[in-house]
Amino acid sequence: MGKVIGIDLGTTNSCVAVMDGKNSKVIENAEGMRTTPSIVAFSDDGERLVGQPAKRQAVTNPERTFFAVKRLVGRRYDDPMVEKDKKLVPYKIVKASNGDAWVEADGQTYSPSQVSAFILQKMKETAEAHLGQKVDQAVITVPAYFNDAQRQATKDAGKIAGLEVLRIINEPTAAALAYGLDKTKAGTIAVYDLGGGTFDVSILEIGDGVFEVKSTNGDTFLGGEDFDMRLVSYLADEFQKEQGINLRNDKLALQRLKEAAEKAKIELSSTTQTEINLPFITADQSGPKHLTMKLTRAKFEALVDDLVQKTIEPCRKALKDAGLTAGEIGEVVLVGGMTRMPKVQEVVKQLFGKEPHKGVNPDEVVAIGAAIQAGVLQGDVKDVLLLDVTPLSLGIETLGGVFTRIIERNTTIPTKKSQVFSTAEDNQNAVTIRVFQGEREMAADNKILGQFDLMGIPPAPRGMPQIEVTFDIDANGIVNVSAKDKATGKEQQIRIQASGGLSDSDIDKMVKDAEANAAEDKKRREAVDAKNHADALVHSTEKALAEHGSKVAEPERRAIEDALSDLRESLKSDDAEVIKAKTNTLAQASMKLGEAMYTQQAESDAAKHAAKDDIVDADFTEVDDDKNNKKSA
């Protein structure tokens, strides 16, 4: 069995780790970074860029650069959160044929699962380069408050990327694993996870290798991206007041503002003031305009205060669900890049009455925990038991549109629960089971996960048939539902697939696309490498020809020039094989030139040596220092 990797698929950054002996190790990517920006872009010529290369060109290519796509995973196009996102991002969010929110570049649409798969592929390649072996299994983390559709979409992303997802694990739980693996003392901890796009809080009991989640709560649309956008809005407003130009209408300017906002936010975690300086941000009839502004930490904290305060209520709910007070929490572990913000740390301290624990790297701890869980599944990590919970209640719609819970939120998973229902009308021969997830009392106010029909119920007065509905949640938090007529034994079951979501054929097509793209990417890479090698040879040959061309016979010189010309021509194409062949031809032809250079060098060295041999050593006499304090030659 090959290595199973742990991946933190983040909104802003992603990270991959693997068990190395008894320890979990974060793997550096090709750029030498321990985290990879969760950004995918398409260049003018259709080349796909992932991570740092995509981030570097975002300012000049905003409409084809996808960031924070995790916030769209498993969401419908008409979701209020998607409406909010559409106004803030420079790329197009479009309605897919199944009603989901997808993204578009150059007329080509991509599902959020597909974009996530491009990032997962990068993580997979990073691990393979480090391990020197193929990797096809992973544990992937998701926000604890992700619903079933979002978890399923994440699993789909893994499949598209060529990974078998052995387990979907909640981010705070993964962080707790990393924090508590070497702790011998039992205790209760809170994991406060404020990342790039989501907020989660989980309460766990840790002891004797058992990690038991008591409760979880959160907000899947609250994170660093919102802090950035709040600052972008402020900068745009201030610039409009000063210059009368609305930068929101200029996608390129907006992307520059976003980059500057993120940089300023990070700087203000370690300094009390920063300067935002964006020359030539736009122009009007009077000429170019520059944006220069000083921003204090106090001003930034005032701008985002309500966002920080929004994290308090989920913490209180999680404590209440766990049956605990803040004083009973032994340690608060901070996870996610946003927890570096002093204001966030201050709010956590006020809420829990203690200094938060800062001994873990907030950007890496989730991936480390995922790798530990991978180690548990592989049998490399012993005596660790992880008991997670379902974040939201699950149930069905019953008479009058009421939401009847079958599995309450914060129930330990995996779990299976049944409840008996009946018909609402006389002689009813079929029932439709509509499955929902959420905490509202009316079904319509919750998230519909799917529906199915149980047919062939024998005629009977209403209330007589016994229909047993069973919910089964696996360790990934993914739901299966069945309905059985107890009188006839007839049963209908479905693995919940959101009313949107990707069908098996969609996933298969995307897997094939990914494989085809992998081959295309390899071909493109080979062409680039061949061109680089050819360019270097052309340059060195031209230089050598200019300096030493007179030392080779005319036919040989002509052969070199012809080979040079052919190679230059081949560089106009992307055919790696042709370029390699022409490179070899030039290398062979220019061997005579190399021989001439070496011959000349050898002759030059011999002449220098001979000249050295002709030097006559001078005689000298040593004079007694006492008499004459010097030497004469």
From Swiss-Prot:
Keywords: ATP-binding, Chaperone, Nucleotide-binding, Phosphoprotein, Stress response. It comes from the Bacteria. InterPro entries: ATPase_NBD, Chaperone_DnaK, Heat_shock_70_CS, HSP70_C_sf, HSP70_peptide-bd_sf, Hsp_70_fam. The keyword Phosphoprotein applies. Induction: By stress conditions e.g. heat shock. Coiled coil: none annotated. CDD domains: ASKHA_NBD_HSP70_HSPA9. The modification Phosphothreonine is found at T198. Belongs to the heat shock protein 70 family. This is Chaperone protein DnaK. It comes from Rhodopseudomonas palustris (strain HaA2). The lineage of its organism: Bacteria, Pseudomonadati, Pseudomonadota, Alphaproteobacteria, Hyphomicrobiales.
